Amino acid sequence: MDVNPTLLFLKVPAQNAISTTFPYTGDPPYSHGTGTGYTMDTVNRTHQYSEKGKWTTNTETGAPQLNPIDGPLPEDNEPSGYAQTDCVLEAMAFLEESHPGIFENSCLETMEVVQQTRVDKLTQGRQTYDWTLNRNQPAATALANTIEVFRSNGLTANESGRLIDFLKDVMESMDKEEIEITTHFQRKRRVRDNMTKKMVTQRTIGKKKQRVNKRSYLIRALTLNTMTKDAERGKLKRRAIATPGMQIRGFVYFVETLARSICEKLEQSGLPVGGNEKKAKLANVVRKMMTNSQDTELSFTITGDNTKWNENQNPRMFLAMITYITKNQPEWFRNILSIAPIMFSNKMARLGKGYMFESKRMKLRTQIPAEMLASIDLKYFNESTRKKIEKIRPLLIDGTASLSPGMMMGMFNMLSTVLGVSILNLGQKKYTKTTYWWDGLQSSDDFALIVNAPNHEGIQAGVDRFYRTCKLVGINMSKKKSYINKTGTFEFTSFFYRYGFVANFSMELPSFGVSGINESADMSIGVTVIKNNMINNDLGPATAQMALQLFIKDYRYTYRCHRGDTQIQTRRSFELKKLWEQTQSKAGLLVSDGGPNLYNIRNLHIPEVCLKWELMDEDYQGRLCNPLNPFVSHKEIESVNNAVVMPAHGPAKSMEYDAVATTHSWIPKRNRSILNTSQRGILEDEQMYQKCCNLFEKFFPSSSYRRPVGISSMVEAMVSRARIDARIDFESGRIKKEEFSEIMKICSTIEELRRQK
């Protein structure tokens, strides 16, 4: 039977059908090749928006820097970065006046965090620019390399394990005349393979020491590496994002902690909350505006869009904000918070891999690294690239571009939200001193503005005043991309509001399906996603039931585990049929072992193993949940695991699901091809850390494991722990005298070795 698709929508209010127009099915676009072009675009655009500023030269690095602050007053419609310091400070003062004590309290909270945060906070996060190797690394490795270099250069404050002490080392490292680093390099040589008698290339990894002078070190410390942002839907052009190095990260973390603490106290801030909590916050603001406008006033809402938010923000402005926010605080605290914006005013953008050239005729490919862009003849490039390079050349130093104005993506989300909210705060009648007034919501660069006034002229005047006020602090509302509507219908951070929030279900579409972790996790994640969407996103019972059936079908095709009594032939069907026939209680077999599906929308919260446990044959139970089963490399069994699900846009979300460890919870082994690359040295380092940490946990089981206080090293802590445990075990008769003295001897030997080293 043919279904006319328009019939589906006859009963659906138009606004609920909005989600069908979103570009969220199918694979998102990924970038290929280098991000060099996108990064040059960002650098050139940022300078263009601030071009009327003052040029200066950094005395330490020689980098040319553009400062647009307090430059000419901005022109209408043209995005610009000419923020006025006094306007920003005044906005902060009014924000404090409307929220007495907000800055004071947030500073106190942050001070406590600063004193307690451990340096391992910096191991969170994915790729990080590793300045010692001049490329990206996992955060933990980059941190370890930095600390290793610091220690070999006599910077040892970090040994206390506190982040603030590590940052002291960072500050000191910038005063050193030179720094010695260890870099990895690889040698290739041709050797004859004994087995096959063929010539093969053998690679060996070496480590070599290298001295870096103060100028080069500062450039590296201030460098943000750039990459292309992947998987962005609904855009034709890709764009560049930045990953800062370890020197900057710690300082940024403290600034964002302070800003987060302020945002939590601001009703107009869409950060740091998310999900239903955010919706409730938004609904409150809308309710307030609508209640006040019922009889006499008109109320309109702008779904706002800002032009190039990051590229018009300025670190110098953030410095002014921080100086104001921390005005009565101790000197050390003010200093530590002002370092991040100062580093950002002196930042350098690394241009990435450079360009790849190929000659079709001679079948040749060659890579032009970013370092060469300053000197290469431009005749090889096409016109648009030539223009980019010409423009960026005066800014280049060692393959990085000096980028003083602008804030690269995602660095100070919280602090820039505080700036946005401070302008929304000025909409109160006591500040506008006229008949119109405004309020709204701000979440990083996204905003919604609600304006109330007695008539249309008043609304227009209110919007104009808001627009101009924003301009004074470097926020550029886009007149082309923002639209105004009667209050009650607007969009904010992809939440659609129509007298209440309508579920934008298409956003969740990419997270339905089989994740591809392993059979156990995938089943659990799949049903949890459906459950969560029933709770949060208006997924109705009939649709959920259908989603469940589609998921099970998808799952069976992915893992080739069709029911034991099916006719479908796959690689696994012979084994699964055999199992089916041997099993008495067939309902007890897991879906991944060819069993039936017992899930329906009422029991999605129960892990499959628990759901079927009572139905399983005893020997099947024994095989399934046997910790000695050699095929399972068991992680510690946690009752809750975290999966990364991809919503349609925004960052990947972490989602909790129940984890029951069975023989289906396997962990795939690492791809071996990495062992032949220059990454190998890094991999060996990582394995060493892994071993050390495992050993440490053996000495300090989690029940007794407190973060080490004081400055004893891991080795010292383990030795003293071993001695205490040995004495207790010896005195209670659990170990013999010989064993006791042997342990003591080993401990002394270890200490002796450490002293010699």
Swiss-Prot record:
Residues 55-64 have a biased composition (Polar residues). Residues 249-256 are annotated as: Promoter-binding site. It is found in: Host nucleus; Host cytoplasm. One of its GO terms (cellular component) is host cell cytoplasm. Keywords: Eukaryotic host gene expression shutoff by virus, Eukaryotic host transcription shutoff by virus, Host cytoplasm, Host gene expression shutoff by virus, Host nucleus, Host-virus interaction, Inhibition of host RNA polymerase II by virus, Nucleotide-binding, Nucleotidyltransferase, Phosphoprotein, RNA-directed RNA polymerase, Transferase, Viral RNA replication, Viral transcription. Influenza RNA polymerase is composed of three subunits: PB1, PB2 and PA. Interacts (via N-terminus) with PA (via C-terminus). Interacts (via C-terminus) with PB2 (via N-terminus); this interaction is essential for transcription initiation. Its EC number is 2.7.7.48. Residues 50-82 are annotated as: Disordered. It comes from Influenza A virus (strain A/Memphis/4/1980 H3N2). This is RNA-directed RNA polymerase catalytic subunit. Pfam families: Flu_PB1. The keyword Transferase applies. A motif (Nuclear localization signal) lies at residues 187-195, 203-216. It catalyses: RNA(n) + a ribonucleoside 5'-triphosphate = RNA(n+1) + diphosphate. Belongs to the influenza viruses polymerase PB1 family. RNA-dependent RNA polymerase which is responsible for replication and transcription of virus RNA segments. The transcription of viral mRNAs occurs by a unique mechanism called cap-snatching. 5' methylated caps of cellular mRNAs are cleaved after 10-13 nucleotides by PA. In turn, these short capped RNAs are used as primers by PB1 for transcription of viral mRNAs. During virus replication, PB1 initiates RNA synthesis and copy vRNA into complementary RNA (cRNA) which in turn serves as a template for the production of more vRNAs. It comes from the Viruses. It is an enzyme of class 2 (transferase). Residues 286-483 form the RdRp catalytic domain. One of its GO terms (molecular function) is nucleotide binding. Phosphorylated by host PRKCA. Its main location: host cell.
